[in-house]
Every structure is written in structure tokens, then in C-alpha cells.
């Protein structure tokens, strides 16, 4: 009986694996200069965050609706040790942009929690005192549309009337080596 059970279980496993549909291939990472995908994100519930992005109402928004010339999107995960380590530096960058009268309002920052629920994003925001909006992407739909990059990863989107264009892409190492962090946000505006 044990032998029959193992044989039956093995056949069911093979049958099950053959019936599982293969998913679509992962999206290629975005390239500099290409259009930013027309993805929608949930409008933040917090009034300050909504105001910071220049949004009103509730529901969803497109990146091109953000009231800025450029949007720096940080793809992070609550469980990423590099994201945790660098959170204070990204916060410094946010503060430097907000202190600079030439950059405030022109460059905004938005975090995208890859694989994180609203609860996890909230814990990350509270733990690391993140001053800019963070949006959960629990099912990784947005992360996949953006090329399934590692975390942390940054996408600078130039916002214009024709839609958003990718201005630059970089991991935290480049952000640090390029001298953008901490305290020199003017380099972002030249990207």
C-alpha cells in the first residue's frame, strides 16, 4: 500500500506540474530615455503625503499627475538590509531637496514597497522616520512592470506634458558614489 501511495503521489505531482501555466517573462529593466510605464498607484490616504505629491481625492493616480518636474522613485523592501541601512541617507536627501528653494517642489520622492503590504510599509515608514510617501506593492505588480530590479533601486522620472520619461536608473551604490548623497540634490536635477 505504501508503494502505491508513493506512485500515486508522484503521478499527481507530475500531472500538477504540467498543468501549471508558465507565467509571462519578466519585464526588462527600464532604460534611460524610454517612456515610464503607464502604471497606476493608490493615492495616499495621508493628507500631507497627498498634498506633497500635488494630488487630490482618492482612488489611484498616474506618475504624470504628480506636481513636479521630476520624481525619484525608490524601490525598497522592508526586509532589505541595504534599504534599512540607507533609509537615513535617503531621508537626508529628501530634507536637502525640501530646504533648497530652487529644488523644492521641482523634485519629489516616492517609495514603492516591493512585496510589502500596507502594514509592512507603515512599519518601515515609522521605524526609519521616512518623511516622503511610501506605497505598498504587495503583489509585486508594479515591481514587475518596472523590471523586477533588486532593492534598493532608484528611477528618476522626468515628468513633462507628454508623459514621464526615465531620466536615470541606479542602485544605492551609484547614488552614493555619484556624490548625490547626502546633501547634494542639485546633481539629481542635472541627470
Spans of features found by a protein language model:
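Bacterial N-terminal signal peptides that target proteins for export
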Residues: 1-11
